[in-house]
C-alpha cells in the first residue's frame, strides 16, 4: 500500500529517489509555463524525458481501463513532444502501485490496461530498478 497523501508527496519521494540514483531532475512550475507542460524534466544516462505525475486515490489492479485526470492540453503536449523523438510519459500513483503510461491520445482520459500502453510497478524502487 502506497501512502502518498497527494501528488506533491509522491513527487517529492520520486524526485529524491531519482536524484539518489544520479538522475538530473528539474521540477517544472506549471503556473509559469505553457499549457500542458509536464511536472518533471529528467535526464538519465544522457536521455532526456518529460514526466507528468498524477496521484489517484483508489486501486489500479483488476481494471480494464484507468481513468487519468489529465488537464486540457496535457495529452496533446506529451504526444506532440514524443512524436519529435523525446520520451514522454505519465506516472500515475495509485494506492496499490504506480502505473507508467506511454504518451498518446486516449479517448475521454481512459487508458486501456495492458496492450503495451501501461506498465505496473509496486513502488518507486521497482520503478527505478
Where are these regions (language model features)?
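Acidic-basic catalytic patches of nuclease active cores, encompassing PD-(D/E)XK
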Residues: 1-31, 84
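Beta-rich catalytic cores
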Residues: 36
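Conserved catalytic cores of phosphodiester-cleaving nucleases, focusing on short active-site segments
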Residues: 40-42, 48-58
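Mg2+/Mn2+-dependent nuclease catalytic core
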Residues: 57-81
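Nucleic-acid nuclease catalytic cores
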Residues: 79-108
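Intrinsically disordered, low-complexity terminal regions enriched in charged/polar residues
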Residues: 99-129
